[in-house]
From Swiss-Prot:
Expressed in heart, spleen and colon. PANTHER family: EPITHELIAL CELL-TRANSFORMING SEQUENCE 2 ONCOGENE-LIKE, F-BOX ONLY PROTEIN 16. This is F-box only protein 16. Residues 188-224, 238-292 are annotated as: Disordered. SUPFAM superfamilies: F-box domain (SSF81383). Keywords: Ubl conjugation pathway. The keyword Thylakoid does not apply. Pfam families: F-box-like. Residues 260-273 have a biased composition (Basic and acidic residues). It comes from Homo sapiens (Human).
Length: 292
């Protein structure tokens, strides 16, 4: 008989582990039974411990676990606890992520490219910038290789730089010369102004108006708290039923009670008729009032 073979008689006095700390390793059934008993006992102790004691026990158990066991605990925690801040580009398919980015304007896409390397790769794809270039009929005159990325974004930026969008400038005072100008003298009260005097008066008025305005700096730094990135969020909308109920309450408060007003008018008319009747009766009873 082998030394590590399971015993035939499991109910003998040698296999009793009720009042003993010895665990029969060579017998799997008894070992599982003892493990379940001790696990239940540990659960009862854990229920009676305070929060700080439970944290100390969990910290000690995690420190004793191996790397694979710690990874197992991490996966279990991720299943139980929902993620608070989750990157949708890592969970959604690539096609859906590009579809979401396609609704952004060029400035927002450039801001998204500064989040991380993964977002930079998505925000600079040609599938997004090609549509924005074709919208203004901006084409490229070469066929890019598969290894070249961000060609359409660079082309968009270059075309925007080449646009000459400036405000209309008034000609300088010295350059604005009217040839053969003759002053018209007339004794009439409504004298006509010459074009040169009219231009001088308009320029003086413009200078007076612009003197109060501050000149813009040559370069304005980026806003620390930008507001152009704030979009209309559907989750911020109010409940439609609640808005309808509030509108009805306001209407009821604003509209007067016509039934009550009509009742008050009837009461006033009745009081007036009674007063007139009483005055007429008094005048009949005393037709000749005594003079003082």
């Amino acid at each position: 008989m082998m030394a590590f073979a399971p015993p035939k008689n499991t109910d003998g006095p040698k296999m009793q582990t009720k009042m003993s700390t010895w665990t029969p390793l060579n017998h799997q059934l008894l070992n599982d039974r003892v493990f379940e008993e001790r696990r239940a006992l540990l659960g009862k102790w854990f229920d009676k411990w305070t929060d700080s004691q439970r944290r100390r026990i969990l910290t000690g158990l995690l420190e004793r676990c191996s790397l694979s066991q710690q990874k197992f605990c991490c996966r279990k925690l991720q299943e139980k606890i929902p993620a608070e801040a989750l990157d949708f580009t890592t969970k959604l398919p690539r096609v859906l992520s590009l579809y979401i980015f396609s609704f952004l304007d060029p400035r927002s896409l450039c801001r998204c490219a500064q989040v991380c390397w993964h977002w930079k790769n998505l925000a600079e794809l040609d599938q997004l910038w090609m549509l924005k270039c074709l919208r203004f009929n901006w084409y490229i005159n070469f066929s890019p290789t598969p290894f070249e990325q961000g060609i359409w974004k660079k082309h968009y930026i270059q075309m925007v730089k080449e646009l000459h969008i400036t405000k209309p400038k008034t000609p300088p005072k010295d350059g604005f010369v009217i040839a053969d100008v003759q002053l018209v003298t007339s004794n009439s009260p409504e004298e006509k102004q010459s074009p040169l005097s009219a231009f001088r008066s308009s320029s003086s008025l413009r200078k007076k108006n612009n003197s109060g305005e501050k000149a813009l700096p040559p370069w304005r730094s980026s806003d620390k708290h930008p507001t152009d990135i704030i979009r209309f969020n559907y989750l911020d909308n109010r409940d439609p039923m609640e808005t309808v109920q509030q509108g009805r309450r306001k209407r009821n408060q604003m509209t007067p009670d016509f039934s009550r007003q009509s009742h008050d008018k009837k009461n006033k008319l009745q009081d007036r008729t009674r007063l007139r009747k009483a005055q007429s009766m008094m005048s009949r009873r005393n037709p000749f009032p005594l003079c003082p």
